[in-house]
């Protein structure tokens, strides 16, 4: 039995998070920054940007360990050739990569697995926990 007010380790991260993905330019590939919402529930992160099945869509999922470490999986659809690296990559092409992240109670940081040196680039992730809604609980 848990004491009132005591959170399980995974629950300390639960809540709404603002996710910022930043990919710098590399060679002729333009850089970009995306901001999108994410949610951690029962120690599992899920974030989405865009419309599923459409160019520019990105979905990120993964379990956060009790110490805040996480290996997240990203799956998406290329928005535009100008932002994608690779010889055979164009708008509408599916892609995926892993993210190594570290969460604290109100913030987190992550880095994209760069993949092949010629094709990949060092994208970073910033996670910021959002305040609980003022409508939650009593007003």
Residue ranges and their predicted role:
Residues 11-139:
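Central antiparallel beta-sheet cores of small beta-barrel/beta-sandwich binding domains
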Residues 4-6:
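N-terminal signal peptide c-region/cleavage motif recognized by signal peptidases
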């Amino acid at each position: 039995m848990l004491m009132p007010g005591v959170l399980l380790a995974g629950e300390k991260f639960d809540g709404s998070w603002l996710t910022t993905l930043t990919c710098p330019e590399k060679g002729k590939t333009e850089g970009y920054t995306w901001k999108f919402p994410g949610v951690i529930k029962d120690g599992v992160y899920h974030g989405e940007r865009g419309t599923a099945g459409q160019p520019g869509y990105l979905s990120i999922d993964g379990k956060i360990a009790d110490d805040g470490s996480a290996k997240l999986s990203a799956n998406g659809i290329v928005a535009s050739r100008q932002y994608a690296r690779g010889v055979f990559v164009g708008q509408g092409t599916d892609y995926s990569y892993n993210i190594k992240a570290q969460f604290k109670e109100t913030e987190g940081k992550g880095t994209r697995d760069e993949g092949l040196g010629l094709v990949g680039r060092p994208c970073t992730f910033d996670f910021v926990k959002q305040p609980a809604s003022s409508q939650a609980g009593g007003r």
